[in-house]
Amino acid sequence: RDSSTSRGLGDVYKRQPSGCMHLVFHRGDSLNIHAKGLQPKNFIRGQFSIYGNLISKGNIDMIAIIFHPLGLKPFIQCPMSDLYNRYIDIEDLEDIELNHLKNSISSERNVQTCIQFIELFLMKRLVDIDYNHKRVQNSISQIIKQPQIEVNTLAESACLGYRQFKRIFTNHVGMSPKEYYRVVRFQRVLYLLQNNPKIEIADLTYSCGFYDPSHLVKDFREFSGCSPTQYLSSRSPYSTFFSEDCRLNVIKSHSRA
């Protein structure tokens, strides 16, 4: 859930790191990426470590599939790290079936029918997951459950050397384990602020595994563009990663894993 404001030039939507990758089909007008031009009409959004603004000047009508942290890799034949901080036009992937799906959705106005197209596409590509997938899934579960954990600990738990673990994790998730841990920690901050906007900064720091309040503010500003106090004064915090009312609900999914 991205926050939005109106500046007279269109609605402005704040984009921030979510910890997940998206497959998006615009059926209305494309959003404008601030200072970078229009989003592709149909695209994959990789893992993002940077914030930004998306500007709408027309009719928003899109279908977006938000994947769990490891969810996209079985369906797209490229290293997830190639998608890092990028919007990849579906046409550039040279994926015949995915482009056929794009064309089917663009010509079909019934949303439920489009959802059926997407489900059929995904079902056809389901494959047995490999052992590295299970290793990375376990690492993500540890990151979710433990506010403070070292990458070396994750590598040891996966029975891999540090460099090999980093390479496998990055290829599956789309960013390095250290950076992904920081994004999840940012989402944890949002979730605690969402549930208790008046939480003391010391409690927030401790609960999210930061060394001190200045460390928290530095990371929060890097991922959102402002301090927690400034954030609360301009919008309502919401974590798509941890929120119980979110259908994505990553934390419950990994609790069952």
Regions found by a protein language model. Name each.
Residues 17-31, 69:
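Glycine- and acidic-residue-biased ligand/ion/polar-headgroup-sensing regions
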Residues 2-13:
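Single conserved hydrophobic/aromatic residue that forms the stacking wall/gate
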Residues 152-183, 205-227:
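Basic/polar phosphate-binding segments, predominantly the helix-turn-helix DNA-binding elements
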Residues 37-44:
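Short acidic-glycine-tyrosine-enriched beta hairpin
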Residues 138-139, 185-188:
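Pre-recognition alpha-helix immediately N-terminal to the DNA-recognition helix
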